[in-house]
Protein backbone atom coordinates (compact mmCIF):
# COMPACT_ATOMS: atom_id res chain seq x y z
CA UNK A 1 0.00 0.00 0.00
CA UNK A 2 1.39 3.37 -0.99
CA UNK A 3 1.51 6.46 1.22
CA UNK A 4 -1.48 8.22 -0.36
CA UNK A 5 -3.74 5.18 -0.13
CA UNK A 6 -2.59 4.53 3.47
CA UNK A 7 -3.39 8.12 4.47
CA UNK A 8 -6.82 8.16 2.84
CA UNK A 9 -8.00 4.63 3.65
CA UNK A 10 -6.38 3.98 7.03
CA UNK A 11 -4.90 7.00 8.79
CA UNK A 12 -7.53 9.68 8.19
CA UNK A 13 -10.49 7.42 9.12
CA UNK A 14 -8.68 6.29 12.29
CA UNK A 15 -7.89 9.84 13.36
CA UNK A 16 -11.45 10.99 12.58
CA UNK A 17 -13.06 8.24 14.66
CA UNK A 18 -10.67 7.84 17.59
CA UNK A 19 -9.02 11.24 17.86
CA UNK A 20 -11.53 13.76 16.49
CA UNK A 21 -10.67 17.30 17.51
CA UNK A 22 -7.04 16.51 18.33
CA UNK A 23 -4.09 17.80 16.39
CA UNK A 24 -1.66 15.37 14.82
CA UNK A 25 1.99 15.59 13.95
CA UNK A 26 3.76 12.88 11.97
CA UNK A 27 7.40 12.06 12.70
CA UNK A 28 8.84 10.10 9.81
CA UNK A 29 11.93 8.27 8.72
CA UNK A 30 14.38 10.89 7.41
CA UNK A 31 14.54 8.88 4.16
CA UNK A 32 10.93 9.97 3.53
CA UNK A 33 12.12 13.33 2.20
CA UNK A 34 13.64 11.63 -0.85
CA UNK A 35 11.62 12.22 -3.99
CA UNK A 36 10.26 9.37 -6.10
CA UNK A 37 11.61 9.07 -9.63
CA UNK A 38 8.11 8.61 -11.05
CA UNK A 39 6.47 11.87 -10.00
CA UNK A 40 9.19 13.68 -8.02
CA UNK A 41 7.07 13.75 -4.85
CA UNK A 42 8.34 12.51 -1.52
CA UNK A 43 6.33 10.72 1.15
CA UNK A 44 6.63 13.93 3.16
CA UNK A 45 5.16 15.91 0.24
CA UNK A 46 2.19 13.52 0.13
CA UNK A 47 1.51 13.88 3.86
CA UNK A 48 1.75 17.68 3.60
CA UNK A 49 -0.61 17.73 0.60
CA UNK A 50 -3.11 15.71 2.67
CA UNK A 51 -2.98 18.35 5.42
CA UNK A 52 -0.56 16.79 7.91
CA UNK A 53 2.27 18.46 9.75
CA UNK A 54 5.21 16.12 9.19
CA UNK A 55 8.79 16.37 10.38
CA UNK A 56 11.73 14.05 9.79
CA UNK A 57 13.14 12.24 12.80
CA UNK A 58 16.44 13.72 13.94
CA UNK A 59 18.24 10.49 13.04
CA UNK A 60 17.46 7.02 11.82
CA UNK A 61 20.31 5.27 13.61
CA UNK A 62 19.04 2.21 15.42
CA UNK A 63 21.08 2.86 18.57
CA UNK A 64 19.54 6.31 19.08
CA UNK A 65 16.02 5.01 18.41
CA UNK A 66 16.32 2.09 20.82
CA UNK A 67 17.90 4.34 23.46
CA UNK A 68 14.94 6.73 23.16
CA UNK A 69 12.44 3.88 23.70
CA UNK A 70 14.52 2.57 26.60
CA UNK A 71 14.52 6.04 28.13
CA UNK A 72 10.71 6.09 28.12
CA UNK A 73 10.38 2.51 29.38
CA UNK A 74 12.67 3.11 32.35
CA UNK A 75 11.26 6.48 33.39
CA UNK A 76 8.48 7.16 35.86
CA UNK A 77 6.31 10.23 36.34
CA UNK A 78 4.76 10.85 39.75
CA UNK A 79 5.47 7.24 40.70
CA UNK A 80 3.77 5.78 37.63
CA UNK A 81 4.91 4.59 34.24
CA UNK A 82 5.96 7.34 31.84
CA UNK A 83 5.34 5.12 28.84
CA UNK A 84 1.83 3.79 28.33
CA UNK A 85 0.58 1.71 25.41
CA UNK A 86 -3.14 1.66 24.73
CA UNK A 87 -4.57 -1.90 24.75
CA UNK A 88 -5.95 -1.20 21.27
CA UNK A 89 -2.41 -0.93 19.86
CA UNK A 90 -2.24 -4.67 19.20
CA UNK A 91 0.47 -4.47 16.54
CA UNK A 92 2.77 -2.53 18.87
CA UNK A 93 2.01 -4.85 21.79
CA UNK A 94 2.80 -7.89 19.64
CA UNK A 95 6.05 -6.25 18.54
CA UNK A 96 6.98 -5.72 22.19
CA UNK A 97 6.02 -9.31 23.02
CA UNK A 98 8.65 -10.74 20.70
CA UNK A 99 7.68 -9.95 17.13
CA UNK A 100 10.35 -7.25 17.02
CA UNK A 101 13.57 -9.18 17.37
CA UNK A 102 17.12 -9.69 16.23
CA UNK A 103 17.91 -12.53 13.88
CA UNK A 104 20.44 -15.11 15.07
CA UNK A 105 23.02 -16.12 12.47
CA UNK A 106 23.93 -19.77 11.93
CA UNK A 107 27.20 -19.00 13.75
CA UNK A 108 25.17 -18.12 16.85
CA UNK A 109 25.97 -14.41 16.60
CA UNK A 110 23.12 -11.92 16.68
CA UNK A 111 22.60 -9.45 13.81
CA UNK A 112 23.36 -5.83 14.67
CA UNK A 113 19.96 -4.61 13.39
CA UNK A 114 16.46 -5.92 14.13
CA UNK A 115 14.90 -8.34 11.68
CA UNK A 116 12.70 -6.68 9.04
CA UNK A 117 9.22 -8.16 9.37
CA UNK A 118 5.62 -7.03 9.90
CA UNK A 119 6.47 -6.05 13.49
CA UNK A 120 9.50 -3.96 12.61
CA UNK A 121 7.51 -1.32 10.73
CA UNK A 122 5.26 -0.42 13.65
CA UNK A 123 8.21 -0.50 16.05
CA UNK A 124 10.28 1.71 13.75
CA UNK A 125 7.45 4.26 13.80
CA UNK A 126 7.20 3.95 17.58
CA UNK A 127 10.96 4.49 17.91
CA UNK A 128 10.75 7.67 15.82
CA UNK A 129 7.96 9.00 18.05
CA UNK A 130 9.90 8.17 21.22
CA UNK A 131 13.03 9.76 19.78
CA UNK A 132 11.15 12.92 18.91
CA UNK A 133 9.45 13.12 22.30
CA UNK A 134 12.51 12.21 24.36
CA UNK A 135 13.24 15.12 26.73
CA UNK A 136 16.70 13.71 27.44
CA UNK A 137 17.56 13.36 23.78
CA UNK A 138 16.85 15.01 20.47
CA UNK A 139 13.18 15.92 20.78
CA UNK A 140 12.92 18.24 23.75
CA UNK A 141 9.89 16.51 25.23
CA UNK A 142 7.34 17.70 22.70
CA UNK A 143 4.79 15.03 23.58
CA UNK A 144 4.92 15.18 27.37
CA UNK A 145 1.32 14.66 28.43
CA UNK A 146 -0.12 17.26 30.75
CA UNK A 147 -2.29 16.06 33.59
CA UNK A 148 -3.09 12.49 34.51
CA UNK A 149 -5.43 9.81 33.29
CA UNK A 150 -6.71 6.59 34.79
CA UNK A 151 -4.56 3.59 33.98
CA UNK A 152 -5.99 0.09 34.30
CA UNK A 153 -3.95 -3.08 34.31
CA UNK A 154 -4.92 -5.39 31.46
CA UNK A 155 -4.30 -9.00 30.57
CA UNK A 156 -3.75 -9.77 26.91
CA UNK A 157 -4.36 -13.02 25.08
CA UNK A 158 -3.20 -13.26 21.47
Locate predicted features.
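Mg2+-dependent endonuclease catalytic cores in nucleic-acid-processing enzymes, primarily RNase H-like
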Residues: 1-117, 136-137, 149, 155-158
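Acidic, Mg2+-coordinating catalytic module of metal-dependent nucleases/exonucleases
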Residues: 116-140
